[in-house]
């Protein structure tokens, strides 16, 4: 049989294939770089444009920071980067001044652990990883302004991270003005007497240390003895988001324990109301707004005081109407009053279920605290089994004088509310489960449920509640709060789930704190002239780790090893003195909490961002976005996994800078878009170990893999994430080698809506490649390389098709619907290929090439040049649809006969009812159905249908 496979010599010399695509892509990437094609001029500073006039129509597009991983990119990573590039290129072609840049979020635990494992310094591994990722991204032809790139690990960058920290440290929140103010203004208030000193003291007679302690208690950054997540196996404190629901570290899966440590905190709670309320000003997905609202957890209720042997216990409740049903009180095991409340002995007749098997309440408390030390807050809240111990004492219910037992239990958290609850088992399911387990009374105070089966959490009238009986829930809330306030037993109040931000890590690879301590241990902020505080070079930068189960171990930060760096002599304005540097570092969230501002002015050595540049790129645009526009980046794209923490912290920092007058925008991101994920199949052998997905073959509905011995093994298929550990990662380099970067870009954008997840299929990439080949052939003769474009006028049919495509693609690009834009371009290409076999009219193919440019910029630039244009198409013009060609010439009418569609007709768009009726009756199918009979009714619904009643 004859071998019909094509040889290399059979391929036309000028065919668009991977080799030609690679040459085109390298050439145009070099030209863009040399010409500064994507440079966005600033109003002022080193990046200002060559002319005094700056386009008023600007666009700031930003991707969420990539983290430079040692593994490089897989095909899922560039999805959002390509989408923002398409959006930026489209708007740039429409004449807007577009800022689009990309930096690297390079501090943090992953880089440090990778360095510890490899023995290389994290700075070296980070720089190497950035270089790898930059090379991969460059290959995709992303139109970034490279002058604006940076890494959070650059001293020139973290100098300003430290500077912003100091601005927050040197600020306090004025509740009357509802904004942050410089701490110097607070000091002036105390000095002048405008604000009374605490406890009626005379400010002038207070010692410097006493005054400093008062001022420090107001700062937006402060130090406190707080409950933290201590991970001995990693040797560091972890934030809540770094702890799994099982109470283990997300990285390394080590046990995590709750313990008290002296830590830096940021007073984000001062901004809780503004962080909630200002969500209404943002163009963000509703699910992200809901997640932030839930995280902040604003709730209205009452602060109620229960008398106890150790003083008053304050509880916060959103249901003060149920106070008459409170039959016991529960404190968080870490509550400050627990040790004082624990009785010396168990009272007579104490239920054995209440003691935890301990000889005394104090022993029970100690045992219980130890048993829950490794539980995360999430695990404690979700724990199905209710546990706790009695403290051996009772509190007094303030509304009826009833004695109620006091317990500690892990389902009450010290970090929420007051760390104490009044338990109403009749109307709270967790309380009901606890009361059932411990044999505690369950009282109905809201009618309408069966409290013997479960707590009644619905509406109803108040019962068994004295003066509240017969009232609705809302009426009862107002009434009981009024009575509590009158009797001095409580107040109506608002509470939040949001806790202050734990802002210290016991690691090496992070931003050092610009704080030193004097010989008395008092903290001092460094002056701006001493920034940046650079990380010292350490050969041994690994944190001191401990036995993973050693809950009693204490942190020993790596920076403490740099003794020459820690112990310094500085002149802070009162002569040279000895100081000790802070040996903690900032969390990995710090650098990403303000990077949008640095993109606007990345080379400024005198400020984090000049006011003119911030105003231009991020300032409010009320004419465009309405009177309440908070400003911010015009489009921010990234994964929904950062919905709460990163975005909440960035909003907090932006608001502080806004209050202090450093920025004009009160929000960092005006519009947020969460892209979906690219997923892929992974395969596991019978042991559950992953095998290389690329080596798996499908046969008769089953999947097989051949191991190193040549044995074929049946494997199981699963669908989900792409990753190195799953052995299903595909590098974009592989796809670019095989098809070219433009094909890769077009395929990723055509896979489906940007905000949904989609499966990767390498075999489907060829479809995108064949489309680009068809576009190429419209312009270039594959055999000779000559132009196939004619100067002939397109037909009316083509013009109508073309301008409808322009209108549709224009709308799609603006709405981030790149998949449907691509589909329309494919349809237009197919039409031109079929309609003009001997050569395509220039008037039709040039708009096609321009519309293709955002999706496949390299081949579009090449074709544009071959069409005779010397200037890059990167700045347009983007085609504009002619309204005359958007009008429908004909309209299709379905014809119903006795309620069923029997035929369809095409009539001129301007046809009147009489003409439509005549056309309907003349239709062959309708004429046959009527068989000469006259219809009893014939109704024309203009533009929609013809209805015949026979």
From Swiss-Prot:
Where does this chain carry the motif 'KMSKS' region? Answer: 721-725
- Which domain of life, per UniProt? Bacteria
Pfam families from the UniProt entry? Anticodon_1, tRNA-synt_1_2, tRNA-synt_1g
Coiled coil, from the record:
none
As its record notes, the protein acts as a catalyst of: tRNA(Leu) + L-leucine + ATP = L-leucyl-tRNA(Leu) + AMP + diphosphate
PROSITE patterns named in the record: AA_TRNA_LIGASE_I
Identify the residue span(s) of motif 'HIGH' region: 66-77
GO MF terms listed in the record are: aminoacyl-tRNA deacylase activity; ATP binding; leucine-tRNA ligase activity
What SUPFAM superfamilies does the entry give? Anticodon-binding domain of a subclass of class I aminoacyl-tRNA synthetases, Nucleotidylyl transferase, ValRS/IleRS/LeuRS editing domain
**E.C. number:** 6.1.1.4
Q: Which InterPro entries match?
A: aa-tRNA-synth_I_CS (IPR001412), Leu-tRNA-ligase (IPR002302), Leu_tRNA-synth_edit (IPR025709), M/V/L/I-tRNA-synth_anticd-bd (IPR013155), Methionyl/Leucyl_tRNA_Synth (IPR015413), Rossmann-like_a/b/a_fold (IPR014729), tRNAsynth_Ia_anticodon-bd (IPR009080), Val/Leu/Ile-tRNA-synth_edit (IPR009008)
Q: Enzyme class, one word?
A: ligase
> What is the annotated signal peptide range for this record?
none
Disulphide linkage map: none
Q: Which UniProt keywords apply?
A: Aminoacyl-tRNA synthetase, ATP-binding, Cytoplasm, Ligase, Nucleotide-binding, Protein biosynthesis
Q: Which residues bind ATP?
A: 724
Q: Which compartments does it reside in? A: Cytoplasm
Q: Which residues cross the membrane?
A: none
For biological process, the GO terms are:
leucyl-tRNA aminoacylation
Concerning CDD domains, the annotation shows:
Anticodon_Ia_Leu_BEm
Q: Which GO terms describe its cellular component?
A: cytosol
Q: Give the family per the record.
A: Belongs to the class-I aminoacyl-tRNA synthetase family.
Mind telling me which NCBIfam families this protein's record contains?
leuS_bact (TIGR00396)
Protein name according to UniProt: Leucine--tRNA ligase
Question: What's the source species for this entry?
Answer: Nocardia farcinica (strain IFM 10152)
């Amino acid at each position: 049989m004859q071998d019909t496979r094509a040889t290399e010599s059979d391929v036309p010399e000028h065919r668009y294939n991977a080799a030609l695509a690679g040459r085109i892509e390298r050439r145009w990437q070099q030209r863009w770089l040399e010409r500064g094609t994507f440079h966005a001029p600033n109003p002022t500073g080193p990046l200002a444009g060559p002319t005094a006039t700056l386009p008023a129509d600007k666009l700031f597009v930003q991707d969420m920071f990539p983290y430079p991983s040692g593994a490089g990119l897989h095909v899922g990573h560039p999805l959002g980067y390509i989408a923002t590039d398409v959006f930026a290129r489209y708007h740039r072609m429409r004449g807007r001044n577009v800022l689009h840049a990309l930096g690297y979020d390079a501090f943090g635990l992953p880089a440090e652990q990778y360095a510890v494992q490899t023995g290389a310094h994290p700075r070296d591994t980070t720089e190497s990883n950035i270089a790898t990722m930059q090379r991969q991204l460059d290959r995709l032809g992303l139109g970034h302004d490279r002058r604006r790139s940076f890494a959070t690990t650059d001293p020139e960058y973290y100098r300003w991270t430290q500077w912003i920290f100091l601005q927050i440290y040197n600020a306090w929140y004025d509740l009357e003005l509802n904004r942050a103010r410089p701490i110097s203004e607070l000091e002036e208030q105390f000095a002048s007497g405008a604000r009374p000193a605490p406890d009626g003291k005379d400010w002038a007679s207070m010692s410097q240390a006493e005054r400093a302690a008062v001022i420090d208690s107001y700062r937006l950054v402060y130090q406190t003895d707080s409950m933290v997540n201590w991970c001995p196996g990693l040797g560091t404190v972890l934030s809540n988001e770094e702890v799994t629901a099982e109470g283990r570290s997300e990285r390394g899966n080590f046990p995590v324990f709750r313990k008290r440590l002296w830590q830096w905190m940021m007073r984000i709670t001062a901004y809780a109301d503004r962080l909630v309320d200002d969500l209404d000003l943002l163009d963000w997905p509703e699910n992200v707004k809901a997640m932030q609202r839930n995280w902040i957890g604003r709730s209205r209720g009452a602060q109620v005081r229960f008398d106890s042997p150790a003083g008053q216990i304050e509880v916060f409740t959103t249901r003060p109407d149920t106070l008459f049903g409170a039959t016991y009180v529960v404190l968080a095991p870490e509550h400050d009053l627990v040790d004082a409340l624990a009785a010396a002995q168990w009272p007579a007749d104490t239920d054995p279920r209440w003691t935890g098997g301990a000889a005394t309440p104090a022993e029970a408390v100690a045992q219980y605290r130890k048993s829950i030390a490794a539980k995360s807050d999430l695990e404690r809240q979700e724990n199905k089994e209710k546990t706790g111990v009695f403290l051996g004492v009772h509190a007094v219910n303030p509304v009826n004088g009833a004695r109620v037992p006091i317990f500690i239990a892990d389902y009450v958290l010290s970090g929420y509310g007051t760390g104490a609850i009044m338990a109403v088992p009749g109307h709270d399911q967790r309380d009901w489960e606890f009361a059932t387990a411990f044999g505690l009374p369950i009282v109905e105070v809201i009618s309408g449920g069966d409290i013997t089966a479960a707590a009644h959490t619905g509406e109803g009238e108040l019962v068994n509640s004295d003066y509240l009986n017969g009232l609705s829930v809302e009426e009862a809330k107002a009434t009981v709060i009024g009575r509590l306030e009158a009797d001095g037993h409580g107040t109506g109040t608002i509470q939040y789930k949001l806790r202050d931000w734990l802002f210290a890590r016991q690691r090496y690879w992070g931003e050092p704190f610009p704080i030193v301590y004097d010989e008395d241990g008092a903290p001092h902020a460094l002056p701006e002239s001493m920034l940046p505080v650079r990380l010292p070079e350490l050969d041994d930068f690994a944190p001191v780790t401990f036995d993973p189960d050693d809950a009693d171990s204490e942190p020993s930060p790596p920076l403490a090893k740099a003794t020459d760096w820690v112990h310094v002599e500085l002149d802070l304005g009162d002569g040279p003195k000895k100081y000790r540097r802070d040996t903690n570092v900032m969390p990995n969230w710090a650098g990403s909490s303000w990077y949008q501002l640095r993109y606007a002015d990345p080379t400024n050595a005198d400020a984090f961002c000049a006011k003119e540049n911030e105003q231009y790129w991020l300032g409010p645009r009320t004419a465009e976005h309405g009177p309440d526009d908070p400003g911010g980046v015009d489009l921010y794209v990234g994964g929904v996994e950062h919905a709460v923490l990163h975005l909440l912290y960035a909003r907090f920092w932006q608001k502080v800078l806004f209050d202090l007058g450093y920025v004009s925008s009160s929000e960092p991101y005006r519009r947020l878009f969460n892209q979906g994920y690219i997923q892929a199949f992974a395969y596991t052998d019978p042991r559950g170990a992953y095998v290389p997905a690329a080596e798996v073959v499908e046969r008769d509905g089953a999947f097989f893999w051949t191991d190193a011995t040549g044995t074929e093994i049946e494997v199981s298929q699963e669908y989900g994430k792409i990753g190195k550990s799953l052995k299903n990662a595909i590098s974009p380099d592989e796809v670019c080698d095989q098809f070219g970067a433009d094909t890769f870009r077009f395929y990723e954008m055509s896979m489906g809506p940007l905000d949904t997840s989609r499966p990767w299929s390498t075999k489907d990439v060829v479809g995108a490649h064949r489309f680009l080949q068809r576009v190429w052939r419209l312009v270039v003769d594959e055999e000779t390389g000559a132009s196939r474009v004619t100067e002939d006028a397109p037909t009316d049919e083509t013009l109508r098709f073309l301008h409808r495509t322009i209108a549709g693609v224009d709308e799609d690009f603006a709405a981030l619907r790149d998949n449907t834009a691509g589909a329309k371009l494919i349809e237009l290409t197919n039409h031109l290929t079929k309609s003009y076999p001997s050569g395509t009219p220039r008037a039709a193919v040039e708009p096609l090439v321009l519309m293709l440019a955002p999706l496949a910029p390299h081949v579009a630039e090449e074709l544009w040049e071959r069409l005779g244009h010397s200037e890059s198409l990167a700045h347009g013009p983007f085609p504009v649809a002619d309204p005359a060609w958007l009008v429908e010439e004909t309209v299709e009418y379905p014809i119903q006969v006795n309620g069923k569609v029997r035929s369809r007709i095409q009539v001129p768009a301007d046809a009147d009812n009489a003409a439509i009726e005549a056309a309907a009756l003349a239709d062959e199918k309708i004429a046959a159905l009527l068989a000469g009979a006259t219809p009893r009714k014939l109704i024309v619904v203009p533009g929609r249908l013809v209805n015949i009643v026979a």
